[in-house]
């Protein structure tokens, strides 16, 4: 369900400070974050974010097409390894 328009987009305050600081000094170092719920703002375009997937931080380069989406949409949290084949029991 989308967020109400009167509330506006959500971004974690600590993450916003890190992004503004990186843009101000033109730092190319990736920004590490656990805030998957934050919305991608136009200020973030061109930055690399290290987004936590529950186990490790995955690097994601932010492009213009990602603006308006959440950070967590671009990093999967579950790994699907497929179903195992049925093991037929051999009769002797």
From Swiss-Prot:
Pfam family, one: Ribosomal_S19
Region forming the signal peptide: none
Keywords linked to the UniProt accession: Ribonucleoprotein, Ribosomal protein, RNA-binding, rRNA-binding
Entry's Gene Ontology cellular component terms: cytoplasm; small ribosomal subunit
Keyword set includes RNA-binding: yes
Protein's UniProt keywords contain rRNA-binding: yes
InterPro entries for the chain: Ribosomal_uS19, Ribosomal_uS19_bac-type, Ribosomal_uS19_CS, Ribosomal_uS19_SF
GO biological process: ribosomal small subunit assembly; translation
GO MF annotation terms: rRNA binding; structural constituent of ribosome
NCBIfam families, A to Z: rpsS_bact (TIGR01050)
Role, per record: Protein S19 forms a complex with S13 that binds strongly to the 16S ribosomal RNA.
Family the UniProt entry places it in: Belongs to the universal ribosomal protein uS19 family.
Protein name: Small ribosomal subunit protein uS19
Organism of provenance: Buchnera aphidicola subsp. Baizongia pistaciae (strain Bp)
């Amino acid at each position: 369900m989308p967020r109400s328009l009167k509330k506006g987009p959500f971004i974690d305050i600590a993450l916003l400070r890190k992004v503004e600081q990186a843009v101000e000094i033109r730092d190319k170092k990736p920004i590490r974050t656990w805030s998957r719920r934050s919305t991608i703002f136009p200020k973030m375009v061109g930055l690399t974010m290290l987004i936590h997937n529950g186990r490790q931080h995955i690097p994601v380069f932010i492009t213009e097409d990602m603006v308006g989406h959440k950070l967590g949409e671009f990093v999967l949290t579950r790994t699907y390894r497929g179903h195992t084949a049925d093991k037929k029991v051999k009769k002797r």
